[in-house]
């Protein structure tokens, strides 16, 4: 589906340098951005996501929100990525709808088998 996905991170891509990274990303062949800031307040993540969504539309990039299905839905992101300890996949699918992208983490063989059995 994606050739290159850029994943933001609290430590590797701090907010203070995010604009610099995004300028490069928007001009590159990266086709997906995963918004993954685990330590941001909800309102700050929402505002960042809302602004990033506008830029993603402008530059034809896909936006995925990590862990926060509620934020993904509220900013009309292309989808969300959830882990085994987050909102269950089936609930994320109900909230985001059939057309949204939903990624699921699998950290070991048993989790991979569970993810592989998911439908929808």
Question: Where in this protein do the model-derived segments appear?
Answer:
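Conserved N-terminal beta1-alpha1 strand-loop-helix module at the mouth
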Residues: 1-89, 94-110, 114-120
């Amino acid at each position: 589906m994606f050739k290159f996905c850029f994943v933001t991170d609290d430590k590797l891509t701090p907010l203070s340098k995010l604009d610099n990274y995004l300028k490069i990303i928007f001009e590159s062949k990266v086709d997906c951005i995963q918004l993954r800031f685990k330590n941001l307040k909800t309102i700050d993540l929402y505002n960042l996501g809302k602004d990033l969504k506008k830029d993603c539309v402008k530059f034809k990039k896909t936006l995925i929100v990590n862990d926060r299905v509620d934020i993904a839905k509220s900013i009309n992101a292309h989808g969300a990525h959830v882990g085994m300890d987050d909102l269950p996949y089936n609930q994320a699918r109900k909230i985001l709808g059939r057309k949204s992208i939903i990624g699921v983490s699998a950290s070991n063989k048993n989790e991979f088998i569970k993810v592989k059995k998911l439908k929808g």
